[in-house]
Amino acid sequence: MEKIVNADGSDAICPASAACAKSIRSYQESYSLGEEIANAVTHGIGVGLSIVALVLLVVRAVHYTPADLTARYVVGFSVFGSSLIVLYLCSTLYHALPRGAKYVFGVIDHCCIYVLIAGTYTASCLTTLYGAIGWTVFGVIWGLACSGSVIYSVFGHRVRWLSLVMYIAMGWLVVFVAKPLRERLPEISFLFLVLGGVLYTVGCVFYALKRIKWTHTIWHMFVIGGSVMHFFSLYLSF
């Protein structure tokens, strides 16, 4: 391939390459080494907790649900647990990897938030929100998750605020099915469901304040808290 040079003989930079590099630089968030270690450690712990959660939920479904419902619960709980593992693993890798490797895992990390939201809904759709209403919610939430992931994959950090709004909006779409959930879930399970949503939402405030030191680590802790609440909501749902 012929080398492109400027009129003065210096190497020219391909406009497309320059735009790509600029996008990558704008995406990479300026965390200190201490912050990145804390970010990686917190969600590394989340990976371990997620594996435990997946095992406990599946074991409970196998041993304590009626035979005709077992498959539905196992699949729903498996999707939820797997989405937790994927989210926390990708987040840990993103914060642990060297700066030059962050871009791809950063995009995957943010897309995994959509996966976790949809995975959480899936567990409820297959267990508590069965029937037409369950499949409607399932289709809507996965459609939004796929759309959000594609948008973020194409535009990256430039649509960070749009993604944040979508995360919150998708999470609180649950208000449209709050009545059947309230009627079908034990009170303690419904309480944990709501508490999980509140923790995720409060955590989004710290996510938005990324220019303030340590706020991203605080966001991570709120995410873990929300995940724990939703684990207990599902575990105590029957």
UniProtKB/Swiss-Prot annotation:
The keyword Isomerase does not apply. GO terms for cellular component: plasma membrane. The keyword Zinc does not apply. It comes from the Bacteria. It is a multi-pass membrane protein. It is found in: Cell inner membrane. The chain crosses the membrane at residues 39-59, 74-94, 103-123, 131-151, 161-181, 188-208, 218-238. One of its GO terms (molecular function) is pore-forming activity. Signal peptide: none annotated. Keywords: Cell inner membrane, Cell membrane, Membrane, Transmembrane, Transmembrane helix. It holds the Pfam family HlyIII. Belongs to the UPF0073 (Hly-III) family. NCBIfam families: hlyIII. This is UPF0073 membrane protein TP_1037.
